[in-house]
Amino acid sequence: MRTVQTIAVIAGLLVSLGASPRNAIEPLPRDLEIQLALSALPPHLRDAATVYVLNPARGFEVARPGTNGFHAFVARTGDDAFRGEWPLTKYRDDILYPIAFDNAGAKAQMRIFFDAAELQAKGTPAAELKRIMQQRLKAGFYPAPARAGVAYMLSPVLRTYVNPDANNTVLTANVPHVMYYAPNVSNQDIGGAQPKPGSLYPFVILRGPHGYSIQFLGVTETAAVNREYGDMLARLCSVKQAWCLPTSSPTSNGR
């Protein structure tokens, strides 16, 4: 019995050491991570969606299987980190990217997030990860969605890169929105608005095979989301100051 216990302890230690310390990101409390992931979806899709949590030693794992074809998770290194020429010198611990894909997106864009998380967990340095992912994206390793579809980012909080094609500035934002797949479509093609928080009109981001047309929720709808998730927002703010929302503007904590 003692031998079995010893083996179990050693196995546990090996698993815990699976992710390089410099790559490991402190995971969110499991219940908070699941709640945040599901907040990306509209209410009628939450109960039957598949939910994933991030295991720093392995990557994303299913926390709750679903039946409706939607997949929700919280990325801590987003696909936007692989845009632009700026160097990804380290893994940030403040990125918070709740997103949910339909089945079309799960076979396309979602693979980018999941492969990146797995490589990060295996100890791939940040700069090397960006190089690998950019090469894969350029080579068409990740296909564009096979059909029209949607990704939801209706969570009341998002912290990620503002304009990743240009620089690595990060911002916390309260901008619940819906993203429609728009492969190889430009903002000019759709007569898009100026891409900025609070825009009333759609615009294109991440132009290319994995581009999206963005539509923000209105002021009234956003306020309702904020009220629904007030306790969750307070809890996130207590975990990390960078995740605290502002009181008078849709963005904060930019750097």
PLM region descriptions:
Residues 22-255:
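Primary mode marks residue(s) on the alpha4-beta5-alpha5 output face of response regulator receiver
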Residues 7-16:
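Bacterial N-terminal signal peptides
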Residues 1-6:
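Positively charged n-region of N-terminal signal peptides that target proteins for export
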